[in-house]
Amino acid sequence: MEMFGVHNPAIELATVGLGGAASVRYNFSAAALYEEAIRRGEAELTAQGALRAITGQHTGRSPRDKFVVRDINTDGEIWWDNNKPISPEHFAVLRDDMLAHAAGKELFVQDLVGGAEEGHALPTRVVTEFAWHSLFIRNLLIRPDTAALSSFVPKLTIIDLPSFKADPARHGCRSETVIACDLTNGLVLIGGTSYAGEMKKSVFTVLNYLLPAKGVMPMHCSANVGPDGDAAVFFGLSGTGKTTLSADPARTLIGDDEHGWSENGIFNFEGGCYAKTIRLSAEAEPEIYATTQRFGTVLENVVLNESREPDFNDGSLTENTRCAYPMDFIPNASKTGRAGHPKTIIMLTADAFGVMPPIARLTPDQAMYHFLSGYTAKVAGTEKGVVEPEATFSTCFGAPFMPRHPAEYGNLLKELIGRHGVQCWLVNTGWTGGAYGTGKRMPIKATRALLAAALSGELGQVEFRADTNFGFAVPVSVHGVDGSILDPRSTWADKAAYDAQAEKLVSMFIANFAKFENHVDGGVRDAAPGVKVAAE
């Protein structure tokens, strides 16, 4: 076996059974990985110098093909209602077959770290058969300095072989695609998919399993910090504005997607960003756009024209087009990936039912309730006319990546909020003046003004009213914001229609939360919404 690149000679691929590879390229730089990816026909260069790759059949994650090994250690620790088990025996066969499949191949290795706080970091070795996957994960995780590579010892190994096709009967999985996590032995196997995001989210899943046992809260969130050290955390599902609203030129970006909250404060799990690019423009998101125009960035499933210029408005391959770049490509990004304890937590929702106010203050019990609910709403396409919004509840704002029971994360979050006196807000970036189809999208200018007031502490000084449906505190008036949007009911022409819509949404919340009732205390149960129709 030929070996190239800096690495720890005591921890070679033979230690995980990959000694039969034809060659191994350890910790190659971006330039070297560009050369390899283009030489092998995996990717092509854009006019501006980014590397574009197409993932084929899978243009997003495959949550139905993700499995966790159910063994003596994980049996009582994992939330099996939400995580699919695979037996140790099936996993062993899958592992052996994947190792055999890798024999004779050129492989790429990156030795990286998940977690910017040293005491909670996860040294991770990622073995890939694609050079562009190696560049992707090099961009996304934290890179140790060169001197540290010669003594690097991984605690997690990911083996990523897109050309391997699983056999459901033989391997105990669902299809030819498989993502299998052995949490006890620190091994993740990915086969049958070229979508690079599976690697990133596998690291997140493992950290979400390991950290709560150490009293550290893992979070699917973005985070930033002000000039006075006032950190803020932004929870939110896809499409709620998590990346957009945390990108604030007046504040330093800590990270855009995954963080931990320890006894020392918050820290990024990653060293890069994986941003959506569909309809990306220099005007709306100049910093993210700029990363797509330079060497080192990976563009995933972005359409190029004949001149190799990216067309970010073309979603013909997928709406889930992405770019992956190192954190230091963003001008105001944190160099450490760390900050103190958050002063503010923002929970984002895009309420397409038009019921929720643009901002509401949450008590710790209400914060835990809405964290466990993880609500937003999807809207369908309008080709066949307006359709009903669809409520989406993804507990902890990231159910697919949470191996433990949601109550573990919720109780830890509530305890940290109380201990550090964190102010929590629910921010609705969805619809006002009616539901999707009749109302309009919440003005981004108003959202930014309300957010700025919340982060500065100004919002805490205004008069509040209790929301008649959800019980949380809503500001009556805020300087610089049109007062009419603060009371959603008043923005609807048909008040009875608003009341009916509110009752419908509240009933969805209650039905969804039923599965958590026995796992939370009375204070959180009492934070549930209840309809009280307002006077005309």
Swiss-Prot record:
It catalyses: oxaloacetate + ATP = phosphoenolpyruvate + ADP + CO2. Coiled coil: none annotated. GO terms for biological process: gluconeogenesis. InterPro entries: PEP_carboxykinase_ATP, PEP_carboxykinase_C, PEP_carboxykinase_N, PEPCK_ATP_CS. The keyword Transit peptide does not apply. GO terms for molecular function: ATP binding; metal ion binding; phosphoenolpyruvate carboxykinase (ATP) activity. Involved in the gluconeogenesis. Catalyzes the conversion of oxaloacetate (OAA) to phosphoenolpyruvate (PEP) through direct phosphoryl transfer between the nucleoside triphosphate and OAA. This is Phosphoenolpyruvate carboxykinase (ATP). It comes from Rhizobium johnstonii (strain DSM 114642 / LMG 32736 / 3841) (Rhizobium leguminosarum bv. viciae).
